[in-house]
């Protein structure tokens, strides 16, 4: 999960006092708007619950802030929130969920009311859930799986996603909905009716399918998603495999279909929509698959040259996501985001760097992190360097593995379910 505060507003309260309103974005989507003093008060409250294990909150300034001081506070708030939302102990607490729920509801002026929320499965069918506008993604997922007959013990293998399907166009997985997000608000804030909430499996190693084979209802979801991947040409079956799979579809033999799909190239991978790249030359087209501990890229240059790059997760040195801010007269829209995904990898004794321009950059980053958490090696090999930066700003995050549990005053401990990292500032020159 990547937090950024690319937009601030200077406003006046009812007494005429000026204040700054921070727009907090989660993976390119507006999560909420908040004042510094409100976050400061909440920080004092959670410190009484969690003690000194929390990240340092930006200090108060009793005199008027300069422009540089205001920008420094914004960056410090980014770091603070980034660390908070990636701490599983904090995010599972009532004090966190209640406050983040309130912030989201207040930002969009949404009252808490009951409604029917449609949640889809990969074949386009929907289940209708009796929920509230204030229900979290964790609660909505639990309700959806209950309606689908999937036991609560298997919930960790599934998640809610925002997907987009044009009437005569491609299907796209846009983003994973974080457990503390409010799905109704997420979908309500999108202007296009072709966005929808969908239940999909959430693991990158296809071998994890075996964990769901004891549940008929879970198999149904796996089957529907596998059929979807097959029919959308996300997979690369041979002619013989395709004939056998088509036969299984006609016979509606779900288990046999899933068994055959395990042998098909790119089964269980997420395919990123065709996008632009600077490799092997500017304005090249690239198709990206990510899954099963690797990232596979098919490049097509304007001159007709094609190249296939297949990288194991161990070959990646670092990656970063850049959120390009619009011009001042433009408004950031979640429907059309300008994102770049830049990664470095080892090729022989040299390092190579490639930039991909895709609106699914945050999703791609999330998938890589998910693969790291599933990768069956020692912790030191799991923890790759992840850089998160925002273009047109001087602040970037550089996340490195913790070594021997020692960190300097400039570094702040970032806890994550799968890893412990250090986060500190780097300059523009480090790009």
UniProtKB/Swiss-Prot annotation:
Pfam families, alphabetized: PX, SNX17-27-31_F1_FERM, SNX17_FERM_C
One GO term (biological process): intracellular protein transport
Superkingdom: Eukaryota
UniProt key word Membrane: no
GO CC terms in record: early endosome
Domain PX: 1-107
InterPro entries in UniProt: PH-like_dom_sf (IPR011993), PX_dom (IPR001683), PX_dom_sf (IPR036871), SNX17-31_FERM_F1 (IPR048763), SNX17/31_FERM (IPR040842)
Purpose of the protein: May be involved in protein trafficking.
Membership in a protein family: Belongs to the sorting nexin family.
Protein name: Sorting nexin-31
Gene of this entry: snx31
